[in-house]
Regions:
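Active-site-proximal, substrate-binding regions of enzyme catalytic domains
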Residues: 2-220, 227-312, 316, 325, ...
Length: 344
């Protein structure tokens, strides 16, 4: 049965080792864009690995295009986050103070003192936020990540499909999406108004990867941080493997086996198969970046509300700051380490 359904089975350690020694490494745009979300240490570790395998790196034209188009969007989103956090903090501060005002006649709540503590806590957080923003690298003006990738990937980007082939791919893509054939169909709602190039971007990447394997007669290790089920087989919330349909389609088209990893797993496997020494802390950070689609300030603010409505504890200011900083999301870590970046 294994010979008939190889897409459902893991490779042996021997076969896997062979792939890592011979295959081409292909990176999706989301992996390249996530480099902006890593701390300097994690980013350097990733670049060290890219340098080691640079002679076997290749990326699709579509992935390179998406990186170029979205690079400034990602950079700007990080800058805009400071503004968004300030607006959210200001809104919640007003709501908390309004709530306290409704208890002015409460016999035990010292609302005036509580309001002073709240004011002090929010002012302290605002000052910290200002300091972090001032230290944040201005990648809009000077982008060393872009420059480094431009050198590293020179001559390693595939050609685009001709217009006629793209038009056919769009027609085939619509049918695939309607039938929920991976990859990409999960983008239907999100990207339906962004034009065919964006809507069918995952399929373009996929077909360009297949064509590359046909031309060079070598298999591919594809690294993507896409989390959706049109790339990954999931069971009861747990990611089991890449979609078997993708592995089968690749084999049917190329007679070869494709291996697909998310960035953190790629680093783990490189430690095992390429004698890399990426630390567990870096791998965990890369994993956190993949899992954190956006900086979730709302959760911290809700916790702040609960804390402020408690009983006027003398340590409220420090506790409030702790709550805001305790969740080590990827974006927070990127901000926190921005001063380290400027000193390099």
């Amino acid at each position: 049965m294994k010979n008939k359904f190889t897409e459902y089975y893991k490779l042996s350690e021997k076969d896997l080792k062979s792939h890592w020694e011979e295959d081409i490494f292909c990176f999706d745009a989301n992996v390249l864009l996530n480099l902006y979300r890593y701390s300097p240490n994690a980013r350097e570790a990733f670049f060290r690995l890219l340098e080691q395998v640079k002679d076997r790196i290749w990326i699709t034209y579509q992935a390179a295009l998406e990186y170029q188009k979205n690079r400034l969007v990602v950079i700007n989103a990080q800058r805009e986050a400071y503004k968004d956090i300030r607006e959210t903090l200001g809104k919640k501060k007003g709501e908390i103070e309004s709530k306290l005002n409704s208890f002015k006649k409460h016999p035990y709540l010292q609302t005036t003192e509580l309001k002073k503590q709240i004011e002090s806590a929010f002012d302290s957080i605002s000052r910290d936020l200002d300091n972090l923003e001032n230290k944040h690298p201005d990648y809009l003006d000077n982008d060393p990540i872009w420059e480094k990738l431009s050198v590293l990937l020179e001559g390693k980007v595939g050609d685009d499909f001709p217009k006629e082939e793209l038009e056919k791919l769009y027609r085939d893509g619509k049918k695939r999406y309607d039938e929920k054939v991976p990859p990409g169909y999960m983008d239907m709602k999100e990207k339906q108004n962004e034009g065919n190039r964006s809507l069918y971007g995952d399929i373009i990447v996929w077909k360009q990867v297949i064509e590359k394997a046909k031309v060079v007669d070598v298999s591919i290790i594809l690294i993507t941080d896409d989390l959706k089920e049109d790339w990954w087989y999931k069971f009861k919330g747990k990611t089991i493997s890449p979609r078997p349909e993708l592995i089968k389609e690749f084999k049917d088209e190329t007679s070869k086996r494709i291996n697909i990893y998310q960035a953190d797993k790629f680093l783990e496997m490189a430690n095992r198969n390429l004698a890399q020494q990426t630390t567990k802390e870096v791998i965990q950070e890369v994993r956190n970046v993949r899992l954190a689609d956006e900086f979730d300030i709302e959760k911290e603010i809700r916790e702040l509300e609960m804390l402020f409505e408690d009983n006027g504890d003398e340590n409220v200011k420090e506790n409030a700051k702790l709550l805001v900083s305790k969740r080590e999301s990827s974006f927070e870590k990127a901000i926190r380490n921005s001063s380290e970046e400027q000193n390099k």
